[in-house]
Each structure stands twice: as C-alpha cells, then as structure tokens.
C-alpha cells in the first residue's frame, strides 16, 4: 500500500490546557482493485458494505453490474434490471435506492429499491428524468437536484429543478430550483446540510460555485468559491471539514488533475498532494475519516479500476454536551464522543482556582467533593496524537439533587396536540411526577410521560411548561410553544366566463392549495398556490376539478365535475325573401357552438355558420333560430309567415302592406290578425300576377274551343 502524507497547518488556538497549534493530516492510498474498469458509476455504503453500481466500462457501454465490497474483497451482487450510467444512490430508512441515470436508449426517470436478492422499480414517473444529478435522502424523502435531461450528442445546459419523491405517499413533487443549473457536481450530505461544489452549468461550462442547501426549510446559501472551476470530482466531509478530491479542476490556465483541496475558515486551501491515480467522474463513499474513491477516468481518459482512499486526520472536534446533572456535592457531565484519544475536564468557581483532570477515553464523569449551593463552570477538551481539539462550550451547574428539566416534544393534530417528554437525569432519586402548565394554567398530571391537549383553537399560540419533581424538589422549567392547527375546510365557488372559469374558495385554516384540472383522464393543470382563487383558461367542455388544502395537520380534498358551458342568448336574426327563398343571417352569440334552424317545427339545419338560405314550403312558414352548445339552447328567435311570406320578428311588425297577415312574437304565437295598406310596388306585382293568370285561362279556353270544333 502506497502512502503520501501532508501536514497542513491550521491556526486554531485552544484555551485549555495551554496554547497549542492544531494540524490537519491527509493521506492517500491504493486498495484492492475493483473487478471492472468503470466510469460514471454510483456507490453507497449500506449494511456495512460498499455497493458499486452501474456505470460505463472500457468500451463506453453502460452496464447493469453491482459489485459489493465486504471484509476486504469484492464480489458480484444482484445486477440491476437494466444498464444505468450516471445514476445516484442513497440510503433511506435502512433501504438502498438507485435514482435516475441513463443508458444507450433512454433516461431512467425512476427509482430502484434493493430488496436483498434483486431490485424493483418503485416509481418511474420522475417529473424531469435526469442523470448526473445530486441525489440524497432526508425525512423519508429522496431529493434529486439538477442533472442532465438530454439524450443527444449536443451540449445542452443541465436543469436546476429540486425534485422530491415522498416514500410515504409514493408521489413526486418539484419544490423549487437550485441557484444554478448543475450536473456532475461534487456533493456530500451530512444529515442536515447538503454541500455542493462545482459542476457543469451552462452547456460545457464548469463553475467554481460552492453552495449549502438545507432541505428542512428548502433554502440555499453560498460559500466562498473555489480558486478555479471544477466538475466530476468527489467531496468528503469530516468533523466540519470539507475537502474536494479529483475531477476536472481548471485553475491558472491549466487543468490540475487529482488535486485535493480543503475548506477551512472561509478559504479553500490546496494540500499540495494528489490522488495516486488522478481521476475524474469517479464515485465515492465516506466511512468515518476515510473517503473511498472508486473508478473514474484515469490518465489518458481511460476508465480505471482503482480503489483509492483519502484519509483526513484532525485534532478532535468540539465536544457537544449531552447532559449535566447536579447531585449532592457532585456534578455529573455527559458528552458525545468525538473519536478522541481522551478528554480533559477543567472546572472552577468564583471562589476557587481551575482544576484540570485527565479523565481518559470516557464520555461521562462525575466531579465529586463539591460544595452545595456554589455554581461551578466546566469545560471539556478532547485530545489525540495531533494535539488538543476544540474545547466544548463552558457550562455551569450548582450541586443539588433535584431532577434536570425534562425534554418535551409536541405533535400537532387536528385541533389537538400530543405532548411527550423524557428525563435526562432524575437527580439521583426517582421522579415522582410532573406539573404541566398550559398558558399559565397548571395541573399535576402525576408520573406519566405523555398528555393530549384537546379542543384547541386553530391559530392560537399555546405555551407549555413542564416541571419534574422528586422528593428533594422541583426541576427547572422546560418550555415549548406551538400554534394549534386544524384541517382546512373548503368552500368552493366556480364562476363561468367566456374564455375560461374562475375557481374561488374559502378555507377555515391557512394552507397551501393544489388545484388539478383534468379531462378524460388527462391532467391539464396542476398548480400549487397560497392564493384562494385561480382562473383556468380552457375551452368549453366537462372537467374534473380537484382542490387539495395541505397544512401541518393533513390534507383536505374537494373534488367535483364541472360542466363548463354558458347559456347563450337568443340570436338577433336579419332576413330577406326572394320569391320562394328566405335568407337568414345573424351575429355570433357568446357561448354558442352552433345554431339550429327549424321550419314549422322541423329541423332544417345544424350549422356553425352565421348565415343560411333555404326554400320555403307552400303555405304558412314559422321559422325558429336557436343559439346552442353541448348543454344549453337559447330561447328561439321566431320568424312567422302566412302564405305570402309576410314576416313579423320578435313581436315587432315589419310594415309590408298585405292583408290577412298573422303577427307572431318570439314568445307568443297567438297574436291577433292585422290589416295594413298595400304600397304601389306590391299592388303592381299583384295586378301583374292577376293578368298573367287571366291570360293563361283564356289560352286554355281557346285550345278547348278549337278542339271542340
């Protein structure tokens, strides 16, 4: 095993026990080779083993192999159901998942779950399928940030979406955007914060940007940038130190391959050592202070089968105090282990000098022979072979024997809240009970560890105070506050307009709303909003509407079918008659999809035009014109004619002077007969017709006379 070592000086001044200088040490080594030369693979540390998943081989061909490293050797694990390259792997709730990726035919927009002897697809409906993305898990959710969504050969920008898959609800959601479009970034998630370094951004552009993302509140902050630009590296994180290994690192006009940089005190620093085999687009897992790097492009851009380790050694980090308890002339301190070789405890009071004790490699200690009623100040300092680490915060305690305050947790329900609590130290005597105060009103709840508050008022602030007591006395107060909530009850109103409809709602509780509009099982709209109305622009039709109100208590769903058509008004018809032909035309009516024309109760046509001409039948003709759509028909516009095609429209007589004309309104066909004077033109027409008829009679009589003779 080869080994290179660097001691990088870090100026950290320790208060206890004397001034000293702390160091950081990096080492690199090569371990057992992996079974195949791979690049663009993904990996995870799961069940005490290293899983190396997918990637591309020496022939740039995506593979479905899964290799497992256990007890110092590699073996072939259950293969993926299909080849994947540039996927992401994460462990959530003791389960291994593989997310996204691509192969020679497609981008995989889903998640594979490891089931011990194989893999199964649990979803394939990622909103934006990607590869080369950032993948991690938090709070039973799998996060997918950025990545590439293009399967061609052109250089296109990656995406910047934050896509989240909820393992409890089996649903995807896009919750926001990263500050940049990112792919093939180096990243590490420490359980609460995601550190992101470099990556490809616009097309083939590398970036020097460094970000921290907090999934708890979906926020980003920027850290000082790298000295150069980078993509395809891996990121380690240990005891608050972040370090970047390998990748395409371009600085001062040249690519520096295999570089190792670390971030300290607001500055990126070069360690001046490199990977023993410089790599890009490798994959890695962090196990304690060791970052294990697998595969990647090696020298000459040839996929490597190297398994390398970069180890970081630090003075121990600052210990976190777990508890401090006062007893009779004693103080017991407990702290969380920092992997130190041992610990010093220093304690003092305002009336005594400092006392330092080397307590060895333990995580609790009881200081004895103290004076009751005197406040003591205590500090823990870790140490190892590199020196003293960062001291803990100074804590104080007064020897006594009452309990420590209990730790309270609140689970908010629908107009209720469940309080649970537990003790950190009972003072050396059994806990006898608890006093519970709600907004200042207290009761003795006895020796229980949970209590349910009911009939709460939504939106009201409740302050909970809890005191534990034993036979010596009461603990100090433990306090927590919360705002009561209820499920949102919805009242929904729809206003139909010409170019769409407005969905408006009232809610009894503040919530986020998800409005979904679909038609024939096709989702046309899915929008998340905090507003209480939304205008939906769609054509006329029948739609399924779903409105969900989501808050801390739960989800309220309101669903209904909307028949989106409006009642058209009666058309206003212009008409004219030429001999036996009537011509109709009208203006377009809002809400109408087509028009119906009846003559004497018989449908003549169904037309989408605004004009129509047809021949009248002999005798009286009553014409009705309707504006209609799939669900509504207007009142008719009626044109009535008796024999000589004399027409009256909507109860308003058209002054054509022909006797014996019956007037029919648009709403009433029983109007009385009217007699009007005939004008000159009409009289000439009548006389002409009469003369022609007489001539025809004379011709017929003459023919008969000739035949007779």
From Swiss-Prot:
Kelch repeats lie at residues 49-94, 96-140, 141-192, 193-240, 242-288, 290-340. Residues 315-405, 406-488, 489-566, 568-643 form the Fibronectin type-III domain. The keyword Cytoplasm does not apply. SUPFAM superfamilies: Fibronectin type III, Galactose oxidase, central domain. Residues 1-22 form the signal peptide. PROSITE patterns: FN3. Keywords: Kelch repeat, Repeat, Signal. The keyword Signal applies. This is Kelch domain-containing protein STK_09390.
